[in-house]
């Protein structure tokens, strides 16, 4: 039995893949703050046996009540990274295993790291539960590739570069590959990479170069900080340098600069027509 929290773009993909494996996932529930989104996902999948529910993922008590009612063996968290800790806490209180695709970050600071979630490690171990963090593509598959290479192809890994290239074209002037708020927060904060036992900080998108990708060709690639670096240098101590690169088109970056210049990338509250809004969330 699996409970999926989140019915956005990533949650929709996860629900479809889970539903394609009924031999593994015999019972499925999708839960979100907006139940109608969950119902729309179920309709798109075409499996009326999938259950849906409304839940506030910021509320531990609501989560615990839902978990105790449905009794899943695992919760797949594809909600927002701000909600990782409340969902992990609810899993501990309900005795449920946990999996997510992105590490925790606080709402009021554009900064993410694993320390907040790693602090739960002993509690999950003591409860006999498993928590798998960062199990998307990057982080996730990128870590699996690294582990496979270390096990089967190299005596040790000293230099690691993870490259993320999107060669698709949606013919839109500006669109993000996942939640726009999280995506823009990620790429507008300082870059970081690991070298000789230290973390080196760079300005946002300061370091870039052309990288040539198989079957795609050269693409402008920008150094970012990505959470799997923190985990990989810890688990593969032979690494001397670890970096993460992502491709962006110039049109995308131009729109991003405009968003920043007009203040719409701000994550603090401002007053608009007598209401308190966060510009990036409003966008």
Regions picked out by a protein language model, each given a short descriptive name:
Residues 27-29:
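Short beta-strand element of Class I
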Residues 10-11:
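Hydrophobic/small residue at the entry helix of a nucleotide-binding pocket
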Residues 34-36:
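Helix N-cap at the beta1-alpha1 junction of Rossmann-like dinucleotide-binding domains, i.e.
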Residues 45-59:
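Rossmann-fold cofactor-recognition segment
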Residues 57-72, 79, 83:
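Conserved Rossmann-fold cofactor-binding substructure of NAD(P)-dependent oxidoreductases
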Residues 151-283:
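C-terminal catalytic/substrate-binding lobe primarily of soluble NAD(P)-dependent oxidoreductases
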Residues 102-129:
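Rossmann-fold NAD(P)-binding glycine/threonine-rich loop
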């Amino acid at each position: 039995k699996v409970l999926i929290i989140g019915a956005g773009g990533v949650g929709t993909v996860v629900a479809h893949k889970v539903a394609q494996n009924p031999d593994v996932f015999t019972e499925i529930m999708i839960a979100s703050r907006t139940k109608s989104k969950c119902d729309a996902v179920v309709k798109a999948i075409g499996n009326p046996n999938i259950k849906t529910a409304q839940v506030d993922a910021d509320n531990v008590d609501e989560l615990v009540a839902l978990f105790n009612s449905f009794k899943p063996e695992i919760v797949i968290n594809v909600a927002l990274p701000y909600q990782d800790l409340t969902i992990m806490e609810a899993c501990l209180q309900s005795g449920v295993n946990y999996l997510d695709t992105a590490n925790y970050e606080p709402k009021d600071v554009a900064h993410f790291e694993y320390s907040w979630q790693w602090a739960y490690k002993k509690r999950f171990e003591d409860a006999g539960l498993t928590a798998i963090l960062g199990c998307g593509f990057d982080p996730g598959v990128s870590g699996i590739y690294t582990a496979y290479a270390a096990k089967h192809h190299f005596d040790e890994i000293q230099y690691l570069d993870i490259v993320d290239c999107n060669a698709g074209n949606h013919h839109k002037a500006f669109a993000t590959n996942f939640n726009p708020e999280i995506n823009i927060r990620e790429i507008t904060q300082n870059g970081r990479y690991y070298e000789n036992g230290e973390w080196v900080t760079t300005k946002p998108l300061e370091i870039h170069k052309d990288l040539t990708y198989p079957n795609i060709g050269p693409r402008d690639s920008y150094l970012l900080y990505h959470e799997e670096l923190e985990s990989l240098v810890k688990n593969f101590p032979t690494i001397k340098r670890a970096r993460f690169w992502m491709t962006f088109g110039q049109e995308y970056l131009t729109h991003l600069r405009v968003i920043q210049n007009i203040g719409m990338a701000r994550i603090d509250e401002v007053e608009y027509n007598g209401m308190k809004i966060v510009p990036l969330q409003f966008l």
